[in-house]
């Protein structure tokens, strides 16, 4: 699986979008103190896009690291 898009929704409803794992992880580290309400990860297997939703910062980081 390869990252297609990562959307980080902050507590103030601002949405940060990234298409790289490194940038997504950087956003998570930089914005964690501002409050993150959810992280939506779209990953592709080369044929289909699979979507994952997480409300946990730790789970989101782990999911991104596995891509």
Regions found by a protein language model. Give the residues of each.
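A short, charged, amphipathic alpha-helix used as a generic interaction element across diverse proteins
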Residues: 19-39
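Short aromatic-glycine-(Arg/Gly/Cys) micro-motifs in beta-strand/loop hairpins
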Residues: 1-12, 41-46
